[in-house]
């Protein structure tokens, strides 16, 4: 069972435990141990306590500079990382890609060299190409935090999803967690499969055949607790958590879907389908939600929805990642 600290008294214990953190970068969750995932959850619990105070700021990263480098549009993730950095008293260097030398053809590595020359200790980056953060991590001294790369990974989103579930459930062991949507092209799904599996959850992936990942089935040695399903009723039945994923409209243009409305007819999570899940089940979505396509409006704003809570918890989890990767010994 993962213990999430909820009182200031737990902070001293936390500080003595996090010294074993070994990751300089956060690129995905495939190389995280269960113990390291627990450490992130525990640290995020302390950060959430900080965010509940009248003064939502501590000097843990005072004097550090964190740069944000987003090659793709982002509102929630970028704002969340910036607020997390400022809550730890770090200076934030926000690079506007469209108005920088990048728009003139500057390479990723040259841009990173520039950021390091400007004093960046950490770089939060989002890139359309899968693997770009790994290239960055192998070629610069700053800590790299992956805020999403292509179809590959979005580790901080998966971590905040796990943290949000643990705020409502004592453990993820044995929970049925159902993900519905474009699994094949979702970096959120990919990181969640790693993280949720390591936390002991049983995962059901639900989508049309064309949007399910190839080569991932119940015979997988890596993910033995993952089930693929094309029937949403079967997928949601008995679920403890149901997570919708954004349907990327460009998939329809590539011929993988006959139409958005056709998708909604068979795979939308609405009130009728949600009744098949456990009565105390949670409804989640990484956002932005295409209402009445992935989730019905009533489900998005219903009592079981923790979507807004995910946004709030994201700041605490990203504070935890900054804190752990920095090697700071103070809060």
Swiss-Prot record:
Tell me, what is one Gene Ontology molecular-function annotation carried by this entry? amino acid binding
Write down a Pfam family by its short name: OTCace
Q: Does the keyword Phosphoprotein apply?
A: no
InterPro entries attached to this UniProt entry:
Asp/Orn_carbamoyltranf_P-bd (IPR006132), Asp/Orn_carbamoylTrfase (IPR006130), Asp/Orn_carbamoylTrfase_sf (IPR036901), Asp_carbamoyltransf (IPR002082), Asp_carbamoyltransf_Asp/Orn-bd (IPR006131)
Q: What is its EC number?
A: 2.1.3.2
> What does the record give as its pathway?
Pyrimidine metabolism; UMP biosynthesis via de novo pathway; (S)-dihydroorotate from bicarbonate: step 2/3
Q: Name one GO cellular component term.
A: cytosol
* Superkingdom classification of source: Bacteria
Disulphide connectivity of cysteines? none
Give the record's GO biological process terms: 'de novo' pyrimidine nucleobase biosynthetic process; 'de novo' UMP biosynthetic process; amino acid metabolic process
What are the entry keywords? Pyrimidine biosynthesis, Transferase
**Entry binding sites for L-aspartate:** 104, 187, 246
Question: Which family does the similarity line name?
Answer: Belongs to the aspartate/ornithine carbamoyltransferase superfamily. ATCase family.
Describe the task this protein carries out.
Answer: Catalyzes the condensation of carbamoyl phosphate and aspartate to form carbamoyl aspartate and inorganic phosphate, the committed step in the de novo pyrimidine nucleotide biosynthesis pathway.
The protein here is known as: Aspartate carbamoyltransferase catalytic subunit
Organism whose genome encodes this protein: Dehalococcoides mccartyi (strain CBDB1)
- What gene name does this entry carry? pyrB
């Amino acid at each position: 069972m993962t213990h999430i600290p909820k009182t200031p008294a737990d902070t001293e214990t936390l500080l003595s435990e996090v010294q074993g953190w070994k990751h300089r970068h956060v690129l995905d969750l495939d190389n995280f141990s269960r113990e390291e995932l627990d450490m992130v959850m525990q640290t995020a619990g302390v950060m959430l306590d900080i965010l509940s105070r009248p003064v939502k700021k501590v000097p843990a990263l005072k004097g550090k500079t964190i740069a944000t480098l987003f090659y793709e549009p982002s509102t929630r993730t970028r704002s969340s990382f910036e607020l997390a950095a400022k809550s730890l008293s770090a200076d934030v260097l926000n690079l506007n890609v469209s108005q920088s030398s990048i728009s003139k053809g500057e390479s990723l590595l040259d841009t990173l060299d520039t950021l390091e020359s400007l004093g960046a200790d950490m770089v939060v980056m989002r890139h359309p190409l899968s693997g770009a953060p790994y290239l960055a991590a192998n070629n610069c001294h700053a800590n790299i935090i992956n805020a999403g790369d292509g179809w590959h990974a979005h580790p901080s989103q998966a971590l905040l999803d796990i943290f949000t579930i643990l705020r409502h459930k004592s453990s993820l062991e044995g929970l049925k967690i159902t993900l519905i949507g474009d699994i094949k092209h979702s970096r959120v799904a990919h990181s969640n499969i790693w993280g949720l599996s390591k936390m002991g959850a049983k995962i059901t992936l639900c989508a049309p055949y064309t949007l399910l990942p190839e080569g991932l089935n119940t015979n997988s040695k890596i993910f033995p607790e993952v089930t693929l399903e094309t029937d949403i009723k079967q997928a949601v039945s008995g679920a403890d958590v149901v997570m919708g994923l954004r349907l990327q409209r460009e998939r329809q243009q590539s011929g993988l879907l006959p139409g958005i409305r056709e998708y909604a007819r068979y795979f939308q999570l609405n009130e009728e389908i949600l009744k098949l899940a456990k009565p105390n089940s949670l409804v989640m979505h990484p956002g932005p939600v295409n209402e009445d396509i992935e989730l019905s409006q009533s489900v998005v704003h219903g009592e079981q929805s923790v979507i807004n809570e995910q946004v709030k918890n994201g700041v605490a989890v990203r504070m935890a990642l900054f804190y752990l990767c920095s090697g700071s010994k103070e809060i």
